Amino acid sequence: YEYPQYYLVNPAAYAALGAYMFLLILVGFPINFLTLYVTIEHKKLRTPLNYILLNLAVANLFMVFGGFTTTMFTSIRGYFVLGHLGCNLEGFFATLSGEIALWSLVVLAIERWVVVCKPISNFRFGENHAIMGLAFTWTMAMACAAPPLVGWSRYIPEGMQCSCGIDYYTRAEGFNNESFVVYMFTCHFMTPLTIVFFCYGRLLCAVKEAAAAQQESETTQRAEREVTRMVVIMVIAFLICWCPYAGVAWFIFTHQGSEFGPVFMTIPAFFAKSSSIYNPMIYICLNKQFRHCMITTLCCGKKA
């Protein structure tokens, strides 16, 4: 917190991180804001499923304003100049955003499973279910991001010391880091991923069976396949962005006392931050209705 950490790596590396964060802000803010604005402006986009996708956009904006701006500033300065309070805020927003994204994918996976596999007959995913899903994602995300603020573990500068995360590195007395990390990985990483994989495993079987039996009309099957493909790609993108960070964090936690270079944790941590731009990009690329509405909005109401 007190002086530039240029003894860790070349100062040019800090400048590169600052430029990278500026790029994420430059892309992340407009694309997530546009997702929100277009959905609010076009009534036909205000479907229960899209509530969850909007939730991802809101979480990403939290990350942009609460995390990216802070990290860009500290990268330029070469150390976490904002002190302990700033570290808590940056670590909190990064963790909160990542967890909201993960639990939103859980809700989307359950929705796809219920709608396509029909384990509950005559069930329709409605507005009330979507609102309950939103409340669930925020509750679970807060249950992961808030404890370090009140003494169960803590947020500390990591890697090149210009961004903050959970303390996987030490067994500092009074913080119970070990129990929190086990709780976090079990309840807030492995459990949601297990639910997602279960839902999509059942989903793939149901889609194959329906196609073979021709139980639905071709139009309905195609629409369900498009939505399912979009959500599956979101899950894959999440795994690509966050699994390296989670894997390195767990490795550091289980090898405390060993020496690690500052870049070892910095690269996966900053790579994970790119998750704030991939969900809206996937949504825009794979959802024809949203893409049409977005073009209409950008063309000031003129149909493209």
Swiss-Prot record:
Question: What modifications does the entry list under PTM / processing?
Answer: Phosphorylated on some or all of the serine and threonine residues present in the C-terminal region. Contains one covalently linked retinal chromophore.
Name the UniProt record assigns to this protein: Rhodopsin
The lineage's top-level taxon is: Eukaryota
Q: Which UniProt keywords apply?
A: Cell projection, Chromophore, Disulfide bond, G-protein coupled receptor, Glycoprotein, Lipoprotein, Membrane, Palmitate, Phosphoprotein, Photoreceptor protein, Receptor, Retinal protein, Sensory transduction, Transducer, Transmembrane, Transmembrane helix, Vision
Query: To which protein family does this belong?
Result: Belongs to the G-protein coupled receptor 1 family. Opsin subfamily.
GO biological process terms, alphabetically, are:
absorption of visible light; G protein-coupled opsin signaling pathway; visual perception
Q: Establish whether keyword Glycoprotein is in the entry.
A: yes
Function of this protein?
Answer: Photoreceptor required for image-forming vision at low light intensity. While most salt water fish species use retinal as chromophore, most freshwater fish use 3-dehydroretinal, or a mixture of retinal and 3-dehydroretinal. Light-induced isomerization of 11-cis to all-trans retinal triggers a conformational change that activates signaling via G-proteins. Subsequent receptor phosphorylation mediates displacement of the bound G-protein alpha subunit by arrestin and terminates signaling.
Give a yes or no for keyword Nucleotide-binding in this entry: no
> Which Gene Ontology molecular-function terms are recorded?
11-cis retinal binding; G protein-coupled photoreceptor activity
Q: Which PANTHER family match?
A: OPSIN (PTHR24240)
Tell me the compartments it is located in. Answer: Membrane; Cell projection, Cilium, Photoreceptor outer segment
Q: What is its main location?
A: membrane
Cytoplasmic topology ranges: 39-50, 111-129, 202-229, 286-304
Which residues carry the post-translational modification N6-(retinylidene)lysine, per the record? 273
